[in-house]
Amino acid sequence: PLLNGATVVLAAPDQVRDPLALRSLITAAGVTGMQATPSLWHAVVADSEGELAWVRALVGGEALPGELARTLVSRTAAVTNLYGPTETTIWSTTAEVHADATGVSSIGRPIANTQVYIRDTALSPVPTGGPGELYIAGDGLARGYLDRPDLTAERFVADPFGVPGARMYRTGDLVRWSTTGQLE
């Protein structure tokens, strides 16, 4: 946000625990974008009537339920579903959420400088529509786990599609490419 001229507003712990107090902070500070988990968004938008109409909702950290997606679309300026494990600096893919959101949450496409692969157990590509494990590579990838060489070797594997020495993270998440080029 700061690189784009925005101001960062940090809510106090007591405000985060009180949806009404958090909505008041958003209004008073003129917040135009907020990142939160679906659980927190659910509490914040409950009983809200137009108070968040100018806020861009960034949703991540948990799966985005279809009902909440539709509620957010109707009560905020825009909704972006974010996906990414801590090992890849939390945002790896994004998807704009629209009013026709269904129960299947798209996690979208990779962000800049991020590559995603869907592979089977032999690390072979999976065809469009077929399920496979998600692997993530790119500039946001961590080097591994501190003092956990065995786990690092298991989860951070050689990236056969990158430059020599490149690694990719084995997420353990099952996904598929949709026919529209979105990860689901």
Locate each region found by the language model:
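Adenylate-forming
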Residues: L3-S106, N113-Q115, D120-P125, D150
